[in-house]
Amino acid sequence: MPELPEVEVTRRGVAPHLEGQVITGVALRHTGLRWPFPATLSQTLAGRTVRSTGRRGKYLLIHFDHGTLIIHLGMSGHLRILPSDVPPKKHDHFDLEIGPQLLRLTDPRRFGAVLWHAAEDGSIENHLLLRTLGVEPLEAAFSAQWLYQQTRNRSSAIKQVLLAGDIVVGVGNIYASESLFQARINPKTPAHRIGLARYERLAEAIRQILAAAIEQGGSTLKDFIGVNGQSGYFQQNYFCYARTGEPCRICKTPIRQIVQGQRSTFYCPNCQK
């Protein structure tokens, strides 16, 4: 699943093509993806100008004066900017037409989403999918103190707390494993047993790893590609994720794989205590 870095890479890629541009049409090739497409989306967007783009966790936001288009890439989706005459393929479900170009959503597994939040319904932060999200890990509100305070009553394993998204948002399976490795914290450790000093290491690791992943175009394991059609290459720098049985890059101990909350977790049993 595309995580925060992949969505931010996508946002940065589409922003120059969308911001300030007038939507000339919308193409919907199914009734919906994970949820139905808004019934009047074509009429809602045609002739309107994109004011800005944003991101909240793993959600891409395209802002208009009268509301916000919310796009989620699901398990395997990606967005491309293409000439308007490029014919759609089997898994191309949604086009946002902008004159001679279009923004196309490709989603083979159809777990993504295209939704509309009208300005008259209040702040986009009030949307059902966004209202319970935690702080953004690359913004000032995220800190070791925040992690420490928010986890005093959380007995769940720290890896699962990071994935929950209600304390810090967008740190998915890949980057949670990598951040915990860099911070030298065992992913099974109950969150409330981690002290402020170790949360200092974890907060810094999360910031550094997410920033590096964005600069390297995200991670491409199966499906993700950037807006320009290029794959990300952060996966070349993994220390533990998807390296089961391989020697730790620090101490040579074999990387171990376990399952937490139906998700695979990778860690070094020697480096991460």
Curated annotation (Swiss-Prot):
InterPro entries in alphabetical order: DNA_glyclase/AP_lyase_DNA-bd (IPR015886), DNA_glyclase_Znf_dom_DNA_BS (IPR015887), Formamido-pyr_DNA_Glyclase (IPR020629), FPG_cat (IPR012319), MutM-like_N-ter (IPR035937), Ribosomal_uS13-like_H2TH (IPR010979), Znf_DNA_glyclase/AP_lyase (IPR000214), Znf_FPG/IleRS (IPR010663)
EC number(s) given by UniProt: 3.2.2.23, 4.2.99.18
PROSITE patterns: FPG_CAT, ZF_FPG_1, ZF_FPG_2
Reaction(s) catalysed (UniProt annotation): Hydrolysis of DNA containing ring-opened 7-methylguanine residues, releasing 2,6-diamino-4-hydroxy-5-(N-methyl)formamidopyrimidine; 2'-deoxyribonucleotide-(2'-deoxyribose 5'-phosphate)-2'-deoxyribonucleotide-DNA = a 3'-end 2'-deoxyribonucleotide-(2,3-dehydro-2,3-deoxyribose 5'-phosphate)-DNA + a 5'-end 5'-phospho-2'-deoxyribonucleoside-DNA + H(+)
Record flagged with keyword Lyase: yes
Example of a GO biological process term: base-excision repair
Keywords attached to this entry: DNA damage, DNA repair, DNA-binding, Glycosidase, Hydrolase, Lyase, Metal-binding, Multifunctional enzyme, Zinc, Zinc-finger
Gene3D superfamilies tied to this protein: 1.10.8.50, MutM-like, N-terminal
Active site per the UniProt annotation: P2, E3, K58, R263
Recorded GO MF terms: 8-oxo-7,8-dihydroguanine DNA N-glycosylase activity; class I DNA-(apurinic or apyrimidinic site) endonuclease activity; damaged DNA binding; zinc ion binding
The keyword Ligase is assigned to this record: no
Required co-factors: Zn(2+)
Entry binding sites for DNA: H91, R109, R154
Zinc finger FPG-type: from-to: 239-273
Record's cofactor remark: Binds 1 zinc ion per subunit.
Xref: Pfam families: Fapy_DNA_glyco, H2TH, zf-FPG_IleRS
Family note: Belongs to the FPG family.
Complex and partners: Monomer.
Function summary: Involved in base excision repair of DNA damaged by oxidation or by mutagenic agents. Acts as a DNA glycosylase that recognizes and removes damaged bases. Has a preference for oxidized purines, such as 7,8-dihydro-8-oxoguanine (8-oxoG). Has AP (apurinic/apyrimidinic) lyase activity and introduces nicks in the DNA strand. Cleaves the DNA backbone by beta-delta elimination to generate a single-strand break at the site of the removed base with both 3'- and 5'-phosphates.
Annotated protein name in UniProt: Formamidopyrimidine-DNA glycosylase
Source species of the chain: Janthinobacterium sp. (strain Marseille) (Minibacterium massiliensis)
